[in-house]
Regions:
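STAS-like cytosolic regulatory interaction modules
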Residues: 1-53, 64-108
């Protein structure tokens, strides 16, 4: 099982979480609480360029954070999605619901 490394960075009007490794039921505890706390205060960007695994539990965290963001007037952005993560998100049928960006300059 590959571990998930999470690097936090503050932007002007967002919190960036760079994710690297497997984002799954075993590793989501490393980031889920941080995402949920941050989304109440500011926009959140998940940099998923280096995500090597994404399972249903992790997608559930992303969807819940997306819904929380809408309720609080904030936005959750998915940045530079890896091929593996993209494949898994596409399989849910909800890809069009997410705010997918190529650069943090797109955060509005």
């Amino acid at each position: 099982m590959e571990l998930l490394t999470v690097t936090e960075k503050d932007g002007t009007d967002y919190k960036l979480y760079e994710l690297s490794g497997g984002f799954n039921a075993y590793t989501l505890v490393n980031v889920a609480g941080k995402i949920y706390d941050s989304i109440k205060k500011t926009n959140v960007v998940l940099d998923m360029a280096n995500v090597t695994e994404l399972d249903a539990a992790a997608i559930g965290v992303i969807m819940a954070a997306h819904n929380d963001a809408e309720e609080t007037g904030k936005k959750l952005y998915l940045l530079s999605i890896s091929n593996e993560a993209d494949r898994q998100i596409l399989a849910t049928g909800f890809k069009d619901e997410f705010n997918i960006i190529s650069s943090v300059t797109e955060v509005a």
